[in-house]
Amino acid sequence: LGADVASALNYKLGDDIVTFAEVLRRKGYATGYAGKWHLDGDGKPQWGPKRKFGWEDNRFMFNRGHWKMFADGPNGPRVGSTKNGRPDYGLKGADEKSFATDWLTDKVINFVNEKKGKSFCYMVSYPDPHGPNTVRAPYDTMYEDVKPPIPRSVNKTRAQTPKWAAKAPRITADTIRILMPKYYGMVKCLDDNIGRILDTLRKNGQIDNTIIVFTSDHGDLCGEHGRLNK
């Protein structure tokens, strides 16, 4: 997609769309969703959109944002960090219970345990790995001694850069050296948490009767053409 198109993707999914979750729900599956949805317009974070599209338990679904901390409150889930009274991407004080990747994984595990012995479909949409390149301890320093590769394209002139990347602010090799070890930490944290889900399925005797799909909406440029993210 061109940058002009990608910047306008806060669309609402049409009411007439039948998702695979709705098909499974009609067949008697227990369905649930936690994490980023990004299919209900501009709401941010907008917890538990009213239009569920088959995801019966969508309490922990939020529409937009790459939040780093979450918390459970008396009125439902909330972003765990605020600035000037508004949710922000901070992670001060984040731990294995409040950091977004861990918190969302706990919701998956709770659902899997509750539906043990039943047919279910649960989708978790982790914000990470994604900018801002920050992650909780100990992952924040786990790869600080790693020297990330510096793409040759980072030093090219704007005239040598593809049009979709040429207008955006550029990062330097020094920035890549600082931020990519954090990115590796985000990936490791995600890997460990997916391992927790698999361990739960094994413990419950569900691992051989569960289809597991691991996918992503985009990769990361990792400094190519002076860009991070997509």
Per-range role (PLM):
Residues 1-97, 137, 228-229:
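Catalytic-site neighborhoods of secreted/periplasmic enzymes
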Residues 63-230:
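Active-site-proximal cap/lid insertion segments
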